[in-house]
């Protein structure tokens, strides 16, 4: 099967309606109070590949990404995971309103997860694709394939 090429290497809040986070694996989170950012390291599924006639299971085009939420604050975590893993069911973007200074619009971003919920207020996000997607039978990369946990802001280049 030919390699999957993402439509772009840096996605933004403007692309939200064309994106989907179902079954993404969340590996790590980081709050950067100096930049007013909240970063998430996750495995993003770009495409579900239907099984061929002689196959039973789906395959998945997956790449590690860094999500950077801008002007982020009021982060709330309500997670209970027996294995410490977090699987995203969906990402919701809700309640648009002006920022306190009235210069920007902020929203609630809410990760609905199998293990609970993560929410925050932010003015937008970037999602940076760090590597070319790999075709796998599992819905996430392992630590070796994804080269560990990372909040790298550099997009992949076509390999």
Q: What are these regions, as identified by a protein language model?
A:
Residues 1-159:
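Surface-exposed, interaction-prone regions used to assemble/regulate multi-protein complexes
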